[in-house]
């Protein structure tokens, strides 16, 4: 559906040294999926996203959307392709002197729709985003979440094939963010729109995306299924993002006073719901002290993570045997101490 091939964006001018915001990125985004791009500020996420609809023209590389080499277009052909790509922003960009209905109608008028078509389409799209009762309201009368819903309505009014989302929840509180993400997922499922969403928060990616690319320093350092990225991150930067999101850090003082073997245990799928630790306690006579733990559900798959301290009153070999048993029964075991 969307192919980025060796895309780079260099903001240097004249004889200035190279200033690469995006450095040789290649991605293949499948039709109908919700694809995330995550990274910290300055990673190049927004710049990369804007190459998809050519709001930012690549310095080098190719951008194809639905088989069309959009990076080579200009003028009317480019405008026609952009009508197939909706976009929402973190700061809404609504027209303050126009009602909700007029804001949505504006994008339809710009696409050349007739008044009759607009009259039919606007109520339909406002119903989809849950704003039927706000049709006559002005942006100043809306909450942040409602403003973003108007932005979404405007972006999908012309039935785009692709919806680009530039940090759509960063200006919203947690509850409102969750509602907006649920709406985006609903739109993806109902309308089949391919969504590309960027965020600096892995929690946003976890909530709504099917696959994700991790960016830092203008490069994609890791890409894959969201569950796999959380379960087995490969790159150090990805591990840092995941660890921060899952909040598994232990106080340094606690680590200093530990006696025994400290494990971080990853449970995937059915193993996340099995009594693995109670089994080893019974079988090997070890004491199991759980210091931290949680089960996350990513999509319909369970990911359990526990930090546990294993001790035995007299036989350290029993602890080693217990660790081996846990390794067989679970996806991954990391010895943190001991």
Swiss-Prot record:
It comes from the Bacteria. One of its GO terms (cellular component) is plasma membrane. It catalyses: L-methionine(out) + ATP + H2O = L-methionine(in) + ADP + phosphate + H(+); D-methionine(out) + ATP + H2O = D-methionine(in) + ADP + phosphate + H(+). Gene3D superfamilies: 3.30.70.260, P-loop containing nucleotide triphosphate hydrolases. ATP binds at residues 39-46. The keyword GTP-binding does not apply. The keyword Transport applies. InterPro entries: AAA+_ATPase, ABC_transporter-like_ATP-bd, ABC_transporter-like_CS, ACT-like_dom_sf, MetN_ABC, MetN_ABC_transporter-like, NIL_domain, P-loop_NTPase. Keywords: Amino-acid transport, ATP-binding, Cell inner membrane, Cell membrane, Membrane, Nucleotide-binding, Translocase, Transport. Its main location: membrane. It is a peripheral membrane protein. It is found in: Cell inner membrane. Its EC number is 7.4.2.11. One of its GO terms (molecular function) is ABC-type D-methionine transporter activity. PROSITE patterns: ABC_TRANSPORTER_1, ABC_TRANSPORTER_2, METN. Belongs to the ABC transporter superfamily. Methionine importer (TC 3.A.1.24) family. Part of the ABC transporter complex MetNIQ involved in methionine import. Responsible for energy coupling to the transport system. This is Methionine import ATP-binding protein MetN 2. It comes from Pectobacterium atrosepticum (strain SCRI 1043 / ATCC BAA-672).
